[in-house]
Amino acid sequence: MNLPENSTQLYCEAQAAPQVVRQQLAANSERLERLGERLRQLKPHAVVTCARGSSDHAATFAKYLIETRLKVLTSSAAPSVTSVYEAIPNLAGTVFLAISQSGASPDLLATVRAARKAGALVVALVNAESSPLAQVADFTVPLCAGIERSVAASKSYIASLSAIMQLVGSWKADSALLQSLAAAPALMEQAWQLDWSAAVARLRFASDLYVIGRGLGLGVVQEAALKFKETCGLHAEAVSSAEVRHGPMAIVRAGFPVLIFAQNDETRDGVESLATELAGRRADVMVAGAQAPRSVTLPTISADPVLEPMLIVQSFYRMVNALALARGRNPDQPPYLHKVTETV
C-alpha cells in the first residue's frame, strides 16, 4: 500500500506508548500501593487470569512474572467454562485478574461475576474506566492508554504489560522492579528508533513463519504472531523454544522464516542454542535479543531483563506496520475484524 509508514493509526498509537506508560505509572502509583498492601494481607494461594486476544498475551506475561517474583501459582481461566458450560470453579482465596481494553465482552463479564460469587478478589486492568468490567471489579487499574482507533491493539497491550509490572512490584514491595520500570519510557523511545527493516525485507513475500521465545518473552511472542495475522495477512505461529522441539520444528525447512525473541535471563542460552540449530538447517532465522551464527540480528535495547520483552515489542510494532504496508495491506483495517469484539 502506497502510504507513508507514519500515516497509519497503528504507527501513531504504538509510537505514543512510551508517553502512555509514563503517565500510567504516575497516575496509578498510589492506587497500586493500596492494592499491593491488600494483596500482602490477603496472601492469595493462586492468581487466575481471564482475557482474550492481546490482553490474554499480556496475561501470559503476568503468569511468568507473578510465579517467578511472587511464587504464587497463576493459571488462565477459560471463559467458556462459565459462559457456555455454566460451571463455576471454587475460587475462594484467589485473585482473579481480568485484563481487557474495552471491558465489554459478555463472556469475560460473565466469568468475572461468577468469580466474585465464587470467592475471588477481582482485579481488573482495563482501558475503558467506565466499562462494565470496571464497575464489577473489586479493584480497577486503569491502563490510561487513551482512545485506540486501530483495530490492532498496540499501546493498550504495552500499557497492560507495564501495569502488570507495577502491580507485581507494588504487591511484593519490590523497589528494584519499580525503579527499573520508571526507566522504561525513555528506553521505549530508544527502542522505537531501532532499524528492523531487515525483517521487512525477509517477510514481505512470506506465507508462514514461527515466532519463538520463552518465559517472560512468551507473551510478546504470542502478541507478535497475532499482529502478523491481523495486519499483514501472514500466518504466524507462536511457540516456546522448548515446545517447538516437541513436534513443530519438523516443518522447519530451508528458507522457512523464524523470528526469535530473547531476553537476557535464564532462558537466553536455550533460545540462542535453538536459533543456532535452526540456522544450521538453513532456516531464515532472525533474532532479537540474542545472536546466532548464520542468522540476522535485529537490534534491541539492553535493560533489566523484565523490561526487555516490552522493549522488543515496541520495536516490533514499528516493523510490523511497515511490513503490512509493504505487503499492500492497511494495518488499521484488517478484514472481518472490529475494534471491540464481543464473544459469549
How would you name each of these model-derived features?
Residues 5-44, 139-143, 147-257, 267, ...:
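Active-site phosphate/pyrophosphate-binding segments
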Residues 12-15, 131, 313:
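Alpha-helix N-cap/helix-start motif at coil-to-helix transitions, marked by capping-box chemistry
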Residues 224, 271-274, 312, 335:
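Composition- and surface-driven signal marking solvent-exposed, interaction-prone regions
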Residues 3, 302-344:
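Generic C-terminus detector
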Residues 40-186, 214, 261-306, 310, ...:
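Glycine-rich phosphate-binding loops that contact phosphosugars or nucleotide phosphates
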